[in-house]
A protein has these predicted regions:
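Nucleotide-activated chemistry modules centered on ATP-dependent adenylation/adenylyltransferase
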Residues: 1-214
Length: 216
């Protein structure tokens, strides 16, 4: 059985990837790379979820200091903002790939998987970083099913429920990425270019709920 390293966040996409890859005949080793923004309790929940999904072994690595030193500090110095609006917080993907590749070396495998879809920039960040670090074979389960079905999230939910796995309501609706630099949220009405509902906000309120400034 071939070993494969899966970059694992515990969200819907990467949760789907675990049993999907097992069905394909892989021995799945998950790795969660902590780039900040989560508690120890959540990190433990992610580990437990990986094991319940059937991963052979779960690995957790903390790179908060690396993120601060290698990415966040240079971004602050340069004043660089994504589309002139917010820090490129998804640049933590490069550190995630680096740690996943390190695990590949330890396990003596060249197989690496991620849960990126085929419609965003994350797939480019992951794929190009992996290719830059060596001769690794990339397995992308979400892109594979996107070629066959149109409603990917519901397909993933049905797939997991069919194998007895519970799905939280937030997982089923939104994909949330959080680290030291901020939060990105996608899915549901957001992907349809509609205004997100109040419960989607993680670190702040909607602008119309901001406190009014008092001028003296």
């Amino acid at each position: 059985m071939k070993k494969i390293v899966l970059a694992f966040s515990g969200g819907l996409d990467t949760s789907f990837c675990v049993p999907y890859l097992i069905d394909k005949g892989f021995e799945v080793h998950t790795i969660f790379v902590n780039t900040g923004g989560i508690t120890k309790n959540i990190e433990k929940q992610i580990s437990n979820k990986s094991k319940k999904l059937g991963a052979k072994k779960h690995h957790s690595v903390n790179v908060e200091t690396k993120l601060w030193q290698q990415i966040l500090t240079p971004l602050i110095w340069s004043g660089s903002l994504y589309q002139g609006k917010y820090p490129v917080l998804c640049s933590d993907r490069y550190l995630i790939v680096s740690e996943a590749v390190n695990l590949c070396k330890k396990l003596k495998t060249n197989l690496i998987a991620h849960g990126c879809t085929g419609m965003g920039n994350d797939q480019v960040r992951f794929d190009m970083s992996i290719k830059a670090l060596g001769n690794y074979e990339i397995v992308s389960p979400i892109r594979e099913i996107q070629a066959k079905v149109s409603d990917v999230r519901n397909y993933e939910i049905d797939f997991l429920k069919g194998r007895g796995h519970k799905i939280s309501s937030s997982n089923s609706k939104y994909s949330i990425n959080e680290n030291l630099m901020g939060v990105t949220i996608s899915g549901s009405e957001i992907d349809k270019w509609q205004e997100p509902k109040d419960q989607t906000y993680v670190l702040c309120n909607k602008p119309n709920k901001y406190l009014s400034l008092i001028h003296i």
